[in-house]
């Protein structure tokens, strides 16, 4: 289901209508709160427990309900929306919807995204009655869903009493924003339309007090870091993914400009700092880094990591050649210098901003980079009619994103991770992928949500195996009038799994992907789909997608050989496989 005719883009800004005391309802209050924190679209799947609530969401002038094909994609869409807008929301029904969306909530939790998951719950009169209800697992205890959500959300509100509903809703939404994590709000199905005095006044807009640094701790951290960096001959800066949650991207850029240090980004921080910075040297990803980047980072005698996440994927099976005693690690609220000391209650944005004012300029690492850097060789080309290679595909994607029409690139879990990392992003072009959680199929729903939150076109690179998990919501993209460009890389299987551990389970049934998208299109909305097998066909397809079909959702199936993978995936897969295969420690 979809309100406002299902048109594309976010609804126009509308004044929040203040209800009279006679129609001030829980549903209306929740809807207004969502608008106040920046949500214009709620991704939903209807069910009998949430229908009345959805009516109230639709009635809110500043809010659109976007109906999705399944709850998992609704959650992924809210994830993508939160990446672009700063907060996202989804609405599903009790248990059958809640447990389906749970995987997406786990991904949002791992990526530090404020996501408001709203569940229509049982009638308030049924709690504690020992009754058996549908959409449950057949027990009179209705808390199973709540218990599943508890580890994956930072706050849980079960609203089955109007007296504290106002407080629970406000507390849940504010906690999501403050903690930058998902929250769970369950609303009994009989409550959204009931007036209550606590909702009768105009809700005061949220003002969340910013977290402040302890000034003594901040200055001590600065002094220790400056002394540490001043002793170094060739220090470097490395951006990490927690720059987003700390809202410290601008402060990091200021530090990069002031320090003169060479600047790299961890793979999951791509897009969080401009790649047009004068001393940007690429992606630091251990053995699969951008050419010459790892050599500079790992040979540095000091490195400042801002918001890093070191896991088995980002460290290439724990094989990065980094030393703790050389590192300053800046987390959203904490700074650790070498093996110690550590300083708590230090906000990353404050720390980086103040450090930029006092740091001594040192360009040695970047000077070394310029000395060893060898420009990339001749761009790959295919002979006329030759089977298309993936590196040739990404040569053309690089050219395509160079203009101003592309707002972001999204990479699905798989070889697209590695190929998209090599794209040089122009100023203002975002980049998103789900590295910490790595759930295949994420990008379809996330593309839906991200594209709904921005005006520019979004490019997505998706493998065939991942696409088969969540393909249905291409339908919702069409209903919303989105204009994204999807490159479906058809190489016959789960390529990333093949390079970690091969087996017959990594081979999938081939689909007629173009036929599938045309069937979903069914003559409604603007859609164009094609299949390409050689470079000439690819060039023609991109020309059409960016020309005559620029106002359409464009789907380009790229047929590739099953063994056509990036060298980075081959290296990364072997190292992750080795990490996974470590024998048990002796007892």
From Swiss-Prot:
Binding site for Mg(2+): 464, 491, 493
Positions that bind substrate: 48, 135, 497
Signal peptide (residue range): none
Reaction catalyzed: a 2-oxocarboxylate + H(+) = an aldehyde + CO2
Pfam families with a match to the protein in the record: TPP_enzyme_C, TPP_enzyme_M, TPP_enzyme_N
Positions of the UniProt region annotated as Thiamine pyrophosphate binding: 415-496
GO MF entries: magnesium ion binding; pyruvate decarboxylase activity; thiamine pyrophosphate binding
Superkingdom of the source species: Eukaryota
Cofactor(s) annotated in UniProt: a metal cation; thiamine diphosphate
EC identifiers of the protein: 4.1.1.1
Family to which this protein belongs: Belongs to the TPP enzyme family.
Oligomeric form and interacting partners: Homotetramer.
Protein name: Pyruvate decarboxylase 3
Organism expressing this protein natively: Oryza sativa subsp. japonica
Lineage, uppermost ranks: Eukaryota, Viridiplantae, Streptophyta, Embryophyta, Tracheophyta
């Amino acid at each position: 289901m979809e309100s406002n005719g299902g048109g594309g883009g976010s609804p126009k800004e509308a004044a929040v209508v203040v209800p009279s005391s006679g129609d001030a309802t829980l549903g209306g209050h929740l809807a207004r709160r969502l608008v106040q924190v920046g949500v214009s679209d709620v991704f939903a799947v209807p069910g009998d427990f949430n229908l009345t609530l959805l009516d109230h969401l639709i009635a809110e002038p500043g809010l659109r309900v976007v109906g999705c094909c399944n709850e998992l994609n609704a959650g992924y869409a809210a994830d993508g929306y939160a990446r672009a807008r700063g907060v996202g929301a989804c609405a599903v029904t009790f248990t059958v919807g809640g447990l389906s969306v749970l995987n997406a909530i786990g991904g949002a939790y791992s990526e530090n995204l404020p996501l408001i998951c709203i569940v229509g719950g049982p009638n308030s009169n049924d709690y504690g009655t020992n009754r058996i209800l549908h959409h449950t697992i057949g027990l009179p205890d209705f808390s199973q869903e709540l218990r599943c959500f508890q580890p994956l959300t930072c706050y849980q509100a079960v609203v089955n009493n109007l007296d504290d509903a106002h407080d629970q809703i406000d507390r849940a939404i504010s906690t999501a924003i403050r903690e930058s994590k998902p929250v769970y709000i369950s609303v009994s199905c009989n409550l959204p339309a009931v007036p209550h005095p606590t909702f009768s006044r105009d809700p005061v807009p949220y003002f969340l007090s910013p977290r402040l640094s302890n000034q003594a701790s901040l200055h001590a951290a600065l002094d220790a870091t400056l002394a540490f960096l001043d002793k170094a001959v060739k220090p470097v800066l490395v951006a990490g993914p927690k720059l987003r949650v700390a809202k410290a991207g601008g402060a990091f850029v200021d530090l990069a400009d002031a320090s003169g240090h060479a600047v790299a980004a961890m793979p999951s921080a791509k897009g969080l700092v401009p790649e047009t910075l004068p001393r940007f040297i690429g992606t630091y990803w251990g053995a699969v880094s951008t050419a010459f980047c790892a050599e500079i980072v790992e040979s540095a005698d000091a490195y400042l990591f801002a918001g890093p996440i070191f896991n088995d994927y980002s460290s290439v099976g724990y094989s990065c050649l980094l030393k703790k005693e050389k590192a300053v690690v800046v987390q959203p609220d904490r700074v650790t210098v070498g093996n110690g000391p550590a300083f708590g209650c230090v906000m990353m944005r404050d720390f980086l901003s103040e450090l930029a004012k006092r740091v001594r300029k040192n360009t040695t690492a970047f000077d070394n980079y310029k000395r060893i850097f060898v420009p990339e060789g001749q761009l790959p080309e295919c002979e006329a009619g030759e089977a298309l290679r993936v590196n040739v595909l990404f040569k053309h994607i690089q050219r395509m994103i160079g203009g101003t029409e592309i707002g972001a690139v999204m990479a699905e879990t798989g070889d697209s991770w590695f190929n998209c990392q090599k794209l040089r992003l122009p100023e203002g072009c975002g980049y998103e992928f789900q590295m910490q959680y790595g759930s295949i199929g994420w990008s379809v729903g996330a593309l839906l949500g991200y594209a709904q939150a921005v005006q520019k076109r979004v490019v997505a690179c998706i493998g065939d195996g991942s696409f088969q998990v969540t393909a249905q919501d291409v339908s919702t993209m069409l209903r919303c009038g989105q204009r994204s460009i999807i490159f479906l890389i058809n190489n016959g299987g789960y390529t990333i799994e093949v390079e970690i551990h091969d087996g017959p389970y990594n081979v999938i049934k081939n689909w007629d992907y173009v036929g599938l998208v045309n069937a979903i299109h069914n003559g409604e909305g603007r859609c164009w789909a094609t299949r390409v097998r050689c470079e000439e066909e690819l060039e023609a397809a991109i020309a059409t997608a960016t020309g005559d079909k620029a106002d359409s959702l464009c789907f380009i199936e790229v047929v590739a050989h099953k063994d056509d993978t990036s060298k980075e995936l081959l290296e990364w897969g072997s190292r992750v496989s080795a990490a996974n295969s470590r024998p048990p420690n002796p007892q």
